[in-house]
């Protein structure tokens, strides 16, 4: 008689938890990065919603002039924002327990720091989770690399720029009009439109939109016909089919004749690498530009570059931009300082007879 003994697998609770976290069979993959991503993004989202609706005014400039940002304090969806942490706090870590009371924490803009730091940690973990899922499925890692562009951009405006300027009050407000205000002030103080890295970012975003539209329309227009001419070509396609849907040779021929031969890709991998790399590299450069301007390495200054034989300035477009910058600079934080830095840095004339 033969006795077969089956050894029972005794999986601990921790082991089952690990298997569940790293399982690719779940409807939504969690992963170890997800263990940190889920609570941080939930915290950032929850506090953002509550603060956007009900946060009291914040003393953003540290001069006892609170600015209202929430819906219950008179704003709408367009004008509302999470007001950045007060200049009185600077770059100090300012959790709730560091304040004397919750009222003080709210008055000094504590929710902004809480939201931003949790959000940045969350999106960084989302990027790591993309890599983790790719790794478990045996895929290449480029999805996470592409996502690093918006992560870098968010890190630049929410963390690097405040560090360079010395205060979280200089970070980008979390709202529509607050974003526009940040952009206008950034142009006034750093002349970002004249920074080559910003120009590369504009080329990346607009070029990426153009290439995406061109690619999508070209593929949709060169479907492989599986039907008669009496019914739609779309009827010949079934979602998830293994066969190729469109004819890249036909698309290449069309585009090559529309512009010229070498403007068209005949290799699908090269084409899709280009479509991914163009906007990603552009946004990388923009994030790098914000990070350098954070430490006041600003855009090009061509003010008063052209003069006539008598030394009189002939205004160029750079001088028009400079005048606009000065106008924007004197208008923002109008109660925090009497003159923009450009004017205040000039030595005052002596008044002692």
Swiss-Prot record:
One BP annotation, GO: photosynthetic electron transport in photosystem II
**Which residues participate in chlorophyll a PD1 binding?**
198
What are the GO MF terms of this UniProt record?
chlorophyll binding; electron transporter, transferring electrons within the cyclic electron transport pathway of photosynthesis activity; iron ion binding; oxidoreductase activity, acting on diphenols and related substances as donors, oxygen as acceptor; oxygen evolving activity
Cofactor binding notes: The D1/D2 heterodimer binds P680, chlorophylls that are the primary electron donor of PSII, and subsequent electron acceptors. It shares a non-heme iron and each subunit binds pheophytin, quinone, additional chlorophylls, carotenoids and lipids. D1 provides most of the ligands for the Mn4-Ca-O5 cluster of the oxygen-evolving complex (OEC). There is also a Cl(-1) ion associated with D1 and D2, which is required for oxygen evolution. The PSII complex binds additional chlorophylls, carotenoids and specific lipids.
Posttranslational mods: Tyr-161 forms a radical intermediate that is referred to as redox-active TyrZ, YZ or Y-Z.
Q: Which residues cross the membrane?
A: 29-46, 118-133, 142-156, 197-218, 274-288
EC annotation from Swiss-Prot or TrEMBL? 1.10.3.9
Its annotated compartments are: Plastid, Chloroplast thylakoid membrane
Q: Which residues form the propeptide?
A: 345-353
Topology in membrane: Multi-pass membrane protein
Q: In this record, what's one Pfam family? A: Photo_RC
One of the record's GO cellular component terms = chloroplast thylakoid membrane
What reactions does this protein catalyze? Answer: 2 a plastoquinone + 4 hnu + 2 H2O = 2 a plastoquinol + O2
**Binding-site residues for pheophytin a, renumbered to this chain:** 126
Which keywords does UniProt give here?
Acetylation, Calcium, Chlorophyll, Chloroplast, Chromophore, Electron transport, Herbicide resistance, Iron, Magnesium, Manganese, Membrane, Metal-binding, Oxidoreductase, Phosphoprotein, Photosynthesis, Photosystem II, Plastid, Thylakoid, Transmembrane, Transmembrane helix, Transport
Q: What does this protein do?
A: Photosystem II (PSII) is a light-driven water:plastoquinone oxidoreductase that uses light energy to abstract electrons from H(2)O, generating O(2) and a proton gradient subsequently used for ATP formation. It consists of a core antenna complex that captures photons, and an electron transfer chain that converts photonic excitation into a charge separation. The D1/D2 (PsbA/PsbD) reaction center heterodimer binds P680, the primary electron donor of PSII as well as several subsequent electron acceptors.
Its UniProt miscellaneous note says: 2 of the reaction center chlorophylls (ChlD1 and ChlD2) are entirely coordinated by water. Herbicides such as atrazine, BNT, diuron or ioxynil bind in the Q(B) binding site and block subsequent electron transfer.
Q: Which family does it belong to?
A: Belongs to the reaction center PufL/M/PsbA/D family.
Give the protein's recorded name. Answer: Photosystem II protein D1
What's the name of its gene?
psbA
């Amino acid at each position: 008689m033969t006795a077969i003994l089956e050894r029972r697998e005794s999986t601990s609770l921790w082991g089952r938890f690990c298997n569940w976290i790293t399982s690719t069979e779940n409807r939504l993959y969690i992963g170890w990065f997800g263990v940190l991503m889920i609570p941080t993004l939930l915290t950032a989202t929850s506090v953002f919603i509550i603060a956007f609706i009900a946060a009291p005014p914040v003393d953003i400039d540290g001069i006892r002039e609170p600015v209202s940002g929430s819906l219950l304090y008179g704003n709408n969806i367009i004008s509302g924002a999470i007001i950045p942490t007060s200049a009185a706090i600077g770059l100090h870590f300012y959790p709730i327990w560091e304040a004397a009371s919750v009222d003080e924490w709210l008055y000094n803009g504590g929710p902004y720091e809480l939201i931003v730091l949790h959000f940045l940690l969350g999106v960084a973990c989302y990027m790591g989770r993309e890599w983790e899922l790719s790794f478990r499925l045996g895929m290449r890692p480029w999805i996470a690399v592409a996502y690093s562009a918006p992560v870098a951009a968010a890190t630049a405006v929410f963390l690097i720029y405040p560090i360079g300027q010395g205060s979280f009050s200089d970070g980008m407000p979390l709202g529509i009009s607050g974003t526009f205000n940040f952009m206008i002030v950034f142009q006034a103080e750093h002349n970002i439109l004249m920074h080559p890295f910003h120009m590369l970012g504009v080329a990346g975003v607009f070029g990426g939109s153009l290439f995406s539209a061109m690619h999508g329309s070209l593929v949709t227009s060169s479907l492989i016909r599986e039907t008669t001419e009496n019914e739609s070509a779309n009827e010949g396609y079934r979602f998830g089919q293994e066969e190729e849907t469109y004819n890249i040779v036909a698309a290449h021929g069309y585009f090559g004749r529309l512009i010229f031969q070498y403007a068209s890709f005949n290799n699908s991998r090269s084409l899709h690498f280009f479509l991914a790399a163009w906007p990603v590299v552009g946004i990388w450069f923009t994030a790098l530009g914000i990070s350098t301007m954070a430490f006041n390495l600003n855009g090009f200054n061509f003010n008063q570059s052209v003069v006539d034989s008598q030394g009189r300035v002939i205004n160029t477009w750079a001088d028009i931009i400079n005048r606009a910058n000065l106008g924007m600079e004197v208008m923002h934080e109008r109660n925090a300082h009497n003159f923009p830095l450009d004017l205040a840095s000039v030595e005052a004339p002596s008044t002692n007879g």
